[in-house]
C-alpha cells in the first residue's frame, strides 16, 4: 500500500493551483457562455426566462459576490427563489446557472495546465477515425479473440458528497473553491445523505451539465487510476505484512526453483505475470475488463481492485458490481449489442493425391447480435407497436404531411440499420423494418381514413424505397433484376460505420 500511496502522490504532484480568484473575472463567464453555445449536445444554460447572456448581469453577480453577506444569505435561504439571491428572484435563476458554469470553467484549468506542464511518459498516437463509438468494435474483433476472461464492472454512483470534494482536494488545493463546490452539492442534495436519489442526480445533471460532467469525469479518473497502477506494478505487489500476498511470495519462490531447472519455461511464465494482457473499455457508467489467464488469477485481480477501491474511496465496494465470467461461455451487453466470443467449428476438406482428409478446426469469432426483444420493447414504448411486436398507427403524427410522416419513419428505420450494420445476424433487423413500415402505412391510412391495402397500392414502390438503407440501394442498383419487394441483402456481411459519434435515440435507452 505504501507503493500505491507513493505512486499516487507522484501522479498528483503537478496539480496544485489556486483558481478561486478567477471567479471574479468577467471573461470566465463569457467563456462559459461560448462553450454552452458550441457544445456538441444542446444545453439550456446561461439564460433566464428566454433571456440571452448579459454582461451587465455578470457584473452585478461579481459585485454581489464581493459583499460579505452574499453567501450567508444563500445558505440561510436555499429554497427561496432558486439559488444565490432570495431578494431578487428575477435574476436568481440566471445566477444559479451561470455561476456553476463559470465555476466549471475555472476548476478545469488545473487539469488543462497539468497536461502542458507535467512531462509525458509516452506520446500517444492520435487517430482521427477513433472518434466513432464503432471504432471499439474492430478493436474487440482484434483483441478479444485471444483473451479468456471478462469482468463486467458497474461504476457505482452511490458515493458520499464529501468524498467527491476530497477527491478534488488532492488535485486542487484551493480551500475557497472546495467550499463553493460543497455549496453547490448541498443545494441539490441533503448534505447528510448519499447520492442515492436518481431524481437529485437527474436535476443536477439537467441544470449543470458541465459541472456534472466535470465531477463525473474526476470520479471516474480516480476510479480508473487504480487500473493504471496495477497495470504498471503488476509484478511488484509483495507486501510481507499482509497475509493476502503470502501465496504470491511462495509462488515466486517456486518460480525461482522452476527457473533453475527449466529456463525457457521460467522466462515465459514471468512475462505472463508481468504482462497480464489487460484490456479496459468504459461506456455509459459501465466498464469491461478483459484479460488472459486462468480463472483463479483473474479472480485475484478482481479482489485487488475491490480492496484498493475501498481504500481509495473509503466506502464499501459491493462485490456484486464486478461480474467475472469466462469469455467463451458468456455474452455481454455492449453499446446496443449482445456480444460474445463463442467457439465455432470449421470443417475443411483437404485432398492429397488419392487421400481425402476432413479437418475440423475450432475457431473463435466475435459474435454481435441485435437485442431484438429490447428494441421491440422500446418501439412499443414509443407507440409504434404493441408489446408483442404487432404494428399500430401513431395518431400523434397524423397532423403532419404525408412526406413528413414517410421521412420520420424512414429515418428511424435507416438509423437502426445504420447503427446495427455490424451485427453478425441481420435477420432480426428485417422484423423491425416490417414493424416500422406497417406502422407508417397504418398511420397514413388513419390520416386519410382509408385501409392499409388501398393506401399501399396507391403509393407503390416509392413507399418501400423510403425504408431502404444506403447499402441495400447500392445492391439494388447493381442487381436490377432483383425485385425491390423481395430484396433482403446480405445477412453475413458486417460493416462498421465510422461516422457515428454517438448512440442514436433508439439504442441509448437500452443501456
UniProtKB/Swiss-Prot annotation:
<comment type="similarity">
    <text>Belongs to the intron maturase 2 family. MatK subfamily.</text>
</comment>
<dbReference type="InterPro" id="IPR024937">
    <property type="entry name" value="Domain_X"/>
</dbReference>
<keyword id="KW-0819">tRNA processing</keyword>
<dbReference type="InterPro" id="IPR002866">
    <property type="entry name" value="Maturase_MatK"/>
</dbReference>
<keyword id="KW-0694">RNA-binding</keyword>
<keyword id="KW-0934">Plastid</keyword>
<dbReference type="GO" id="GO:0008380">
    <property type="term" value="P:RNA splicing"/>
</dbReference>
<dbReference type="GO" id="GO:0008033">
    <property type="term" value="P:tRNA processing"/>
</dbReference>
<comment type="function">
    <text>Usually encoded in the trnK tRNA gene intron. Probably assists in splicing its own and other chloroplast group II introns.</text>
</comment>
<keyword id="KW-0507">mRNA processing</keyword>
<dbReference type="GO" id="GO:0006397">
    <property type="term" value="P:mRNA processing"/>
</dbReference>
<dbReference type="GO" id="GO:0003723">
    <property type="term" value="F:RNA binding"/>
</dbReference>
<dbReference type="GO" id="GO:0009507">
    <property type="term" value="C:chloroplast"/>
</dbReference>
<protein>
    <recommendedName>
        <fullName>Maturase K</fullName>
    </recommendedName>
</protein>
<keyword id="KW-0150">Chloroplast</keyword>
<dbReference type="Pfam" id="PF01824">
    <property type="entry name" value="MatK_N"/>
</dbReference>
<dbReference type="InterPro" id="IPR024942">
    <property type="entry name" value="Maturase_MatK_N"/>
</dbReference>
<dbReference type="Pfam" id="PF01348">
    <property type="entry name" value="Intron_maturas2"/>
</dbReference>
Amino acid at each position: 500500500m505504501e507503493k500505491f500511496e507513493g505512486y499516487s502522490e507522484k501522479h498528483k504532484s503537478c496539480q496544485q493551483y489556486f483558481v478561486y480568484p478567477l471567479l471574479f473575472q468577467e471573461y470566465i463567464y463569457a467563456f462559459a457562455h461560448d462553450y454552452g453555445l458550441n457544445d456538441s449536445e444542446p444545453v439550456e444554460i446561461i439564460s433566464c426566462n428566454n433571456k440571452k447572456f448579459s454582461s451587465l448581469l455578470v457584473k452585478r453577480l461579481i459585485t454581489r459576490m464581493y459583499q460579505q453577506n452574499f453567501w450567508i444569505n444563500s445558505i440561510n435561504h436555499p429554497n427561496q427563489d432558486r439559488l444565490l439571491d432570495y431578494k431578487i428572484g428575477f435574476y436568481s435563476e440566471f445566477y444559479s446557472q451561470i455561476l456553476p458554469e463559470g465555476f466549471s470553467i475555472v476548476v478545469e484549468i488545473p487539469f488543462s495546465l497539468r497536461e502542458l506542464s507535467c512531462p509525458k511518459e509516452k506520446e500517444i498516437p492520435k487517430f482521427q477515425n477513433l472518434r466513432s463509438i464503432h471504432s471499439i468494435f474492430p478493436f474487440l474483433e482484434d483483441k478479444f479473440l485471444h483473451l479468456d476472461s471478462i469482468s463486467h464492472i458497474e461504476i457505482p454512483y452511490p458515493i458520499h458528497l464529501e468524498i467527491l470534494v476530497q477527491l478534488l482536494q488532492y488535485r486542487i488545493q484551493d480551500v475557497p473553491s472546495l467550499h463553493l463546490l460543497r455549496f453547490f452539492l448541498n443545494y441539490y442534495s441533503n448534505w447528510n445523505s448519499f447520492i442515492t436519489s436518481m431524481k437529485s442526480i437527474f436535476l443536477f445533471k439537467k441544470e449543470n451539465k458541465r459541472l456534472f460532467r466535470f465531477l463525473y469525469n474526476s470520479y471516474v479518473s480516480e476510479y480508473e487510476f487504480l487500473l493504471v497502477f496495477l497495470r504498471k506494478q503488476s509484478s511488484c505487489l509483495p507486501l510481507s505484512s499482509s497475509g493476502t500476498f503470502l501465496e504470491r511470495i511462495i509462488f515466486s519462490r517456486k518460480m525461482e526453483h522452476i527457473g533453475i531447472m527449466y529456463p525457457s519455461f521460467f522466462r515465459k511464465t514471468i512475462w505472463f505475470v508481468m504482462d497480464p494482457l489487460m484490456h479496459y473499455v468504459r461506456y455509459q457508467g459501465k466498464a469491461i475488463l478483459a484479460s488472459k489467464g486462468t480463472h483463479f488469477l483473474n479472480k485475484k485481480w478482481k479482489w485487488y481492485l475491490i480492496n484498493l477501491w475501498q481504500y481509495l474511496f473509503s466506502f464499501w465496494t459491493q462485490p456484486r458490481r464486478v461480474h467475472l465470467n469466462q469469455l467463451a461461455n458468456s455474452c455481454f451487453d455492449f453499446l446496443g449489442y449482445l456480444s460474445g466470443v463463442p467457439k465455432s467449428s470449421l470443417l475443411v476438406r483437404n485432398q492429397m493425391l488419392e487421400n481425402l482428409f476432413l479437418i475440423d478446426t475450432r475457431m473463435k469469432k466475435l459474435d454481435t447480435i441485435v437485442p431484438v426483444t429490447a428494441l421491440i420493447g422500446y418501439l412499443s414504448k414509443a407507440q409504434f407497436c404493441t408489446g408483442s411486436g404487432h404494428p399500430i398507427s401513431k395518431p400523434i403524427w397524423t397532423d403532419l404531411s404525408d412526406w413528413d410522416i414517410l421521412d420520420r419513419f424512414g429515418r428511424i428505420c435507416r438509423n437502426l440499420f445504420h447503427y446495427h450494420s455490424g451485427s453478425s445476424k441481420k435477420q432480426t433487423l428485417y422484423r423491425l423494418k416490417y414493424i416500422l413500415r406497417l406502422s407508417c402505412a397504418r398511420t397514413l391510412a388513419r390520416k386519410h381514413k382509408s385501409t392499409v391495402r388501398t393506401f399501399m397500392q396507391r403509393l407503390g414502390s416509392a413507399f418501400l424505397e423510403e425504408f431502404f438503407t444506403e447499402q441495400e440501394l447500392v445492391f439494388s442498383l447493381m442487381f436490377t433484376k432483383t425485385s425491390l419487394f423481395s430484396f433482403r441483402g446480405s445477412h453475413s456481411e458486417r460493416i462498421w460505420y465510422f461516422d457515428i459519434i454517438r448512440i442514436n435515440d433508439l439504442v441509448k435507452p437500452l443501456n
